[in-house]
Amino acid sequence: MVRWAVARIAASLIVATMASGLAPAPPGSDATVRFARISNDPVAHGARLSRVLGCSGCHGALLTGQDWSEPGFARIWTSNLTRAVPSYSDPQLAAAIRGGVRRDGSPLWDMPSHLFMQIANSDMTAVIAYLRSRPPAGPARPLPVFEAGARKEIADGRYRSSPANVARVDTALPADLGAEFALGRHIVRATCAECHGPDLRGGVPYPGAIARPDLRIAAGYDTEQFERLLTNGIAIGDRDVGLMSQVARGRYKYLTEDERAAVLAYLHRLAQPTS
């Protein structure tokens, strides 16, 4: 199933690019880098961030959960957030989003918490406010059932739980290029790294998958071209670039123009040779 393959890209690229034993930054720190606040309403701010961060991409447009099962690998649903969220306290929700753990301490799987560890408290509060505003709908979703394929990859260390991925994050990736590029790095870490890996080098996430490009390719884009890519999904040469085009239209068009410019500036600087 295509959706399941997309989810596995992030987990596989983490395994391929991260060194083990690296301690993550403490979740919940009051980061100084934040997404733009274009509304004083926390629910509206959280709604925008939920789109940028991809909540509906995995949990569905109504956040009622989706079936990501793959025969022979796993039977797995994303949670129906409209049913799950009311039973969590705010700290428990933050721990689920940033740390990949349920309220009972058990691990989530394929929740990309490693992307969200650095999200500022004010932004996290807004996301939680938005999630709490959603009316209950649909049934609760079942816990995952791992079949032979998943069990083998778990045993081999190729498929990891969300908290295991959090524990392996190297906080220097994507590269820290200084305060001037901090916003771009912050956004890239929470979004682009999901498919292109924490070092943004791309690659083939698992056998048979389409290779993800090294994001230093963005050095070939000017501001107008990059705006078109991230808002309309049209790459240089009037091309539709598959998953990237879908993600741009579904997520990155909700970034502000200044946020998209910050991403481009960061990627341009990243592509420059180091002395």
Model features per residue range: what roles?
Residues 1-44, 133, 138, 272-275:
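N-terminal export/targeting leaders of redox proteins
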Residues 25-26, 32-34, 73, 107, ...:
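A short alpha-helix capping/helix-coil boundary motif
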Residues 27-51, 153-188, 275:
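Electrostatic cytochrome c docking/interface patches
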Residues 36-37, 43, 60-95, 107-120, ...:
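Gly/Gly-Pro-rich "capping" loops immediately C-terminal to redox-active cysteine motifs
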Residues 47-74, 99-107, 134-139, 185, ...:
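Periplasmic/extracellular electron-transfer cofactor-ligation site
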Residues 91-98, 102, 115-141, 224-229, ...:
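C-terminal capping alpha-helices of c-type cytochrome domains
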Residues 123-183, 262, 266:
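Extended surface/linker regions that mediate inter-domain or inter-protein docking
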